[in-house]
Design a protein with these regions (language model features):
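Acidic helix N-cap motif at the loop->helix transition within catalytic regions
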Residues: 73-79
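N-terminal glycine-rich phosphate-binding loop and ensuing alpha1 helix
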Residues: 10-71
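Short, high-confidence coil segments that cap the C-terminus of an alpha-helix
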Residues: 61, 111, 138-141, 209, ...
């Protein structure tokens, strides 16, 4: 524990580009069976509060923009009023790319790095935020990943067409952190070309940019189903 505290103090003294966080919580959660996952309680607090708190308490995040649905603007603003890093709460778009772009537009121009994070990943740790931001400071683009445990099959028409080498596969998490100008340009290009984008790394990869992968955290799960929400309650109890 002492080593962790000392390491954190040393890292705080190292100069970093200013980094703002865009927390995307604008989806409709069609797999949640009618549960609004933004407001879904985990240990009696809405999920979005847990997520925002992690970035509020991070030493490497200067500013936070939350992107959500129109009807949640006021409730989210009220819930996050005690977090002084929250710069704005804005309305998302029709898809993830539009929502991320809305968040980028709301960030201050002096944020040279941007960390894009899923609002439905409430168990993000300061360690993962820290090492991803620092990697992006060095490489321009970075994301956390964890090794894939299951065997992955390429399936077409219900038939297996191939089995990728599992040792080369990683499940990519968020926050995904980029040079702000790079991400803005990559998303603009993807939008103009109507390119399918599954995450922000995909947009940057299309520009020929390499993304540095850092160690993620298996606890950094994305809440996408009611079962995930039950698992989240168990994970939260473990930390109490």
């Amino acid at each position: 524990m002492k080593v962790t505290k000392v390491t954190r103090q040393i890292r705080k003294m190292l100069p970093l580009k200013s980094c703002g966080a865009v927390i995307v919580a604008a989806g409709n959660a069609t797999r949640m069976g009618g549960i609004d996952k933004v407001m879904a309680p985990i240990d009696r607090e809405p999920m979005i509060v847990h997520t925002v708190r992690a970035f509020q308490e991070s030493d490497v995040i200067r500013q936070i923009v939350i992107v959500t649905r129109q009807e949640l603007i006021v409730p989210v603003m009220d819930l996050c009023s005690g977090f002084d890093k929250v710069h704005a709460v804005v309305v998302g778009g029709s898809d993830r790319v539009e929502s991320v772009c809305a968040g980028l537009q709301a960030l201050s121009n002096d944020m040279k790095l941007v960390a894009v994070h899923d609002g439905a990943r409430p168990f993000i740790s300061w360690q993962v935020i820290d090492r991803t931001v620092r990697a992006a400071h060095t490489y321009g683009a970075a994301a956390p990943g964890v090794p894939v445990k299951d065997t992955i099959k390429i399936v077409q028409g219900g038939v297996v067409r191939g089995t990728p080498d599992r040792s080369t596969l990683q499940a990519i998490q968020t926050p995904q952190v980029f040079d702000a100008a790079l991400l803005k340009g990559a998303l603009k290009k993807a939008t103009l070309e109507n390119a399918p984008i599954t995450d922000d790394c995909s947009a940057v990869e299309r520009m020929g940019m390499s993304v540095k992968i850092v160690e993620g955290d298996e606890r950094n799960i994305k809440i996408a189903t009611p079962l995930d929400l039950q698992l989240a309650e168990l994970l939260k109890k473990e930390t109490l």
